[in-house]
């Protein structure tokens, strides 16, 4: 049996409409949900994942994931850090609406 995933109402009520309708970026919402699931819903603060990992997990192209990561970072919805040029980035989902 699959585990239930409880989403913060802000994610569905506000962020979804903002990213999809206003920014016209469905891929950013999909990537945000995947990163949120891999971190907060799993009780972790951060996750290391390559663009290829995220693309494979979400069904998006690598370029769509790259654009989504760029958009989410610019909006400060996620943070990304790299230890080196060949190391997968470490992502952190920022719940900025909870401040």
PLM feature spans:
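Winged-helix/helix-turn-helix nucleic-acid-interaction surface
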Residues: 61-99
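Short recognition helix of helix-turn-helix/winged-helix DNA-binding domains
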Residues: 1-57, 86
């Amino acid at each position: 049996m699959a585990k239930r995933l409880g989403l913060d109402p802000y994610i569905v009520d506000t962020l979804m409409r903002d990213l999809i309708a206003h920014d016209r970026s469905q891929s950013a919402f999909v990537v945000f949900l995947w990163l949120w699931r891999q971190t907060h819903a799993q009780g972790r603060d951060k996750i290391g994942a390559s663009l290829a990992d995220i693309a494979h997990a979400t069904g998006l192209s690598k370029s769509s994931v790259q654009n989504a990561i760029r958009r989410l970072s610019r909006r400060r919805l996620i943070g990304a850090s790299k230890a080196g040029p060949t190391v997968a980035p470490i992502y952190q989902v920022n719940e900025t609406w909870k401040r």
